[in-house]
């Protein structure tokens, strides 16, 4: 299932990682682990945030998914299902067939 992970980094932990020069390596490790199809980084709500879209093969993968962000950055992590345009078209077509909506 395609999911989006939103990791809102703790400012002090992120500052420490930047000052120590470890931020690039820590982010690379997290990205290598998740292998996202898309990754975006920027300020949301005044805090450094990562938005990653990737395939979660099984719900049992959830604990390990956010762990690098929890342990390295004391981040607030949210994971939720998302769709691309093709997924949405397919879902709406199924909805139309099953709900009787014309």
Where are the regions that the model predicts?
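Conserved, structured core segments of small domains
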Residues: 1-102
